[in-house]
Amino acid sequence: MTQLAIGEATPHGATYDGHGVNFTLFSAHAERVELCVFDSRGNERRYDLPGRRGDVWHGYLAGARPGLRYGYRVHGPWQPAQGHRFNPAKLLLDPYARRVEGELKDHPLLHGGHDEPDYRDNAAVAPKSVVISDHYDWEDDAAPRTPWGKTVIYEAHVKGLTYLHPELPQEIRGTYKALGHPVMVAYFKQLGITALELLPVAQFASEPRLQRMGLTNYWGYNPMAMFALHPAWASSPETALDEFRDAVKALHRAGIEVILDIVLNHSAELDLDGPTFSLRGIDNRSYYWIRDDGDYHNWTGCGNTLNLSHPGVVEYACECLRYWVETCHVDGFRFDLASVMGRTPTFRQDAPLFAAIKACPVLSTVKLIAEPWDIGEGGYQVGNFPPPFAEWNDHFRDAARRFWLPRNLTTGEFACRFAASSDVFKRNGRAPGASVNLLTAHDGFTLRDCVCFNQKHNEANGEENRDGTNSNYSDNHGKEGLGGPLDLMERRRDSIHALLATLLLSQGTPMLLAGDEHGHSQHGNNNAYCQDNALTWLDWQQANRGLTTFTAALIRLRQQIPALTGDSWWEEGDGNVRWLNKNAQPLSADEWQNGPKLMQILLSDRFLIAINATLEVTDIVLPEGEWRAVPPFAGEDNPVITAVWQGPAHGLCVFQRG
């Protein structure tokens, strides 16, 4: 058998230098590593990796070029009780693969074995890693670096956002190309968002259970290859990387940042009955949190949990993040189930991965957003992430819904959440922007469904409506479903307007779910992770244009209010905020805790938000001075209101002084 040259231990993965390819693989417990390369007919040739520096195996294959398909067979002990599951019969993906050929199918040959190893060779059906050359001309691309105080995030799915857009060329709808098309860029600018946050774009797989049901994983939270773009949204797998970078470049030219939702908490290998295609066969003990009995700690609900306190896995995670920043110029990340990142196994603010990110000059300067929980003991960590992380604020989400949709919530609690939840986030030197405020997200009801459904309707997911949360804090306004008489539809509209105004005019970083500005509905499905169909795709032809205009006007208004864009905590007497009752007097202690849901919020001494969240029309006395309602609550030529606003039930209006 031909020998490989010894090569180098860095950089990690498969690196083409113009003359050949250097291969590396981390495995602390392997006894031998074989590089397997495949020709166009699927014939396999194996080479032992001859070099080892620390826990990194390496070798250099002269003459190898981009397009070469390869994988690894890793030899070592089969000792499940100790967490070792080496099985050289299974061809394994390179964790650093930049491109993958083939899908992860529900095939018996892909299972490595439970108690005993499965020695059937899987090369015929296993996905293959592919060597790439990632040269790209970024021209004059520059990161927008929008300050947190001026950031407005728009969470979207690559396919669902554009698949039904009638103004886009048919062949690019639902693809990376569509994201940077002038039609979409113009829409983003008109709406006023500053950052496009994409659901996972790293290559993912559909779980075997879904495949057997004829469904697919639509959202993408089942990662298969963390460095490779999901190929289904590109013209071809070969062009995916450049098409994505073209989109990033176009968005940057328009001043729009790109944030990636990334899944560093588990892999698509799932539990012990899941497929063995990469990490489990490379070094199960190092990559995953292993219980004393050899099974996995399942703090993710997905069968396994990545051990992000292990030095080799910390390095893997950081290199992955740096790859997306340096090679694809993304501007930040939203981390799924991010409490896993801080597990040691208990959560710690000085966990190894947090320390590594903070020390990295590349990663510490991009936007980092945590989903601050997992399902394990001690997994709920809202407010506890270290700088420079921002966090999804579920306190804001729940409080906004409970305030405007008939639930029990005090004025004081609402004000606290409106003020960026300072009781939660004003620590460790963090600014208000650390509170990422949201009403809705990809998981849960859409905003329209929040006002149309009291109960989830997830039957299409095939789990007899057991999946998805039951804590929706929603209100159908008297009738379950989308339709209803005119007065009911008007009440729903008013609730949506009030909720959007609360989101977009509160302190903190607002995140808008794509489609909420259209009135998009998922017909009560609050867990549409497996619905790659018209239920989740945005229907641009049926979009509520008036609601879109209303939302855009709110975002424009937000950018005019220094108290919101300054990203500094409000202090008494600083001129940023005053909290008033319906008579324009400071709220009393009793009104904060027991009063009706009536208040006025004066921002920057110029903008007044009058709130009537009661069920009755109520007169609200405005502060001294001349006030006029501003768009989207009135036209440009608005009469001056000098004294009283007659606030409709569940109503909100914004006035500007003078």
From Swiss-Prot:
SMART domains: Aamy
Keywords: Carbohydrate metabolism, Glycogen metabolism, Glycosidase, Hydrolase
An example Gene Ontology biological process: glycogen catabolic process
CDD domains: AmyAc_Glg_debranch, E_set_GDE_Isoamylase_N
Residue ranges of the region described as Disordered: 459-484
Annotated site (Transition state stabilizer): D443
MF GO annotations: glycogen debranching enzyme activity; hydrolase activity, hydrolyzing O-glycosyl compounds
Keyword Hydrolase: yes
UniProt EC number: 3.2.1.196
SUPFAM superfamilies, per database record: (Trans)glycosidases, E set domains
Enzyme class name: hydrolase
Keyword Hydrolase belongs to the record: yes
Catalysed reaction equations from the record: Hydrolysis of (1->6)-alpha-D-glucosidic linkages to branches with degrees of polymerization of three or four glucose residues in limit dextrin
Pathway named in the protein's UniProt entry: Glycan degradation; glycogen degradation
Family under the similarity heading: Belongs to the glycosyl hydrolase 13 family.
Job of this protein: Removes maltotriose and maltotetraose chains that are attached by 1,6-alpha-linkage to the limit dextrin main chain, generating a debranched limit dextrin.
Protein name: Glycogen debranching enzyme
Organism: Salmonella newport (strain SL254)
Lineage, broadest ranks: Bacteria, Pseudomonadati, Pseudomonadota, Gammaproteobacteria, Enterobacterales
Gene that this polypeptide is encoded by: glgX
